[in-house]
């Protein structure tokens, strides 16, 4: 008997809901939301598009182009949220400050936020932004799952070594509440593991399929 993860079907039907420049423009604060965060060029949009089997999140050759909170509906009560990318040098400082202000407002106010998926480039993990997000997750008690993206850029052995190293650093500095995995959008590596995390946070149980 096979087991079907219901989050898969929902992600494949994901649709764009709205973009918000500030928290007041977000959907009603109810249901389930999972936010996707990451430093600019960490592969956040590619990961979202891979998980939804669509081109919902904008990808760009110029990192840092995501300037809004972008909401994607899975069903009437479940949403994925693409948060602004951070850290790109060519983005003006006032715009960076604007992004940070509204990111902090979103993270600090949304009662329906069930967890954060944090993207780190496996070749350059644990940036200052990543550590800031880990600090926030620890202080707030928010579940966090890390995707070490672009794993296809490293050999299997090098990717595994980086995974173990980052796991150890996070465990020492932030405890055992953060989970982590390797991920590659082009190779679809780690997609099923990411689906299981989403399903757990959104309270969707695996269902047997005859």
From Swiss-Prot:
Residues that bind Mg(2+): 45, 66
Record's GO cellular component terms: cytosol
Alphabetized CDD domains for the sequence: YihA_EngB
Residues binding GTP, per UniProt: 38-45, 64-68, 82-85, 149-152, 182-185
The protein's required cofactors: Mg(2+)
GO biological process: division septum assembly
Domain of life where this protein originates: Bacteria
Protein's UniProt keywords contain Cell division: yes
General function of this protein: Necessary for normal cell division and for the maintenance of normal septation.
Family: Belongs to the TRAFAC class TrmE-Era-EngA-EngB-Septin-like GTPase superfamily. EngB GTPase family.
UniProt xrefs under HAMAP family: GTPase_EngB
Name of the protein in question: Probable GTP-binding protein EngB
Organism in which the protein naturally occurs: Pseudomonas putida (strain GB-1)
Taxonomy of the source species: Bacteria, Pseudomonadati, Pseudomonadota, Gammaproteobacteria, Pseudomonadales
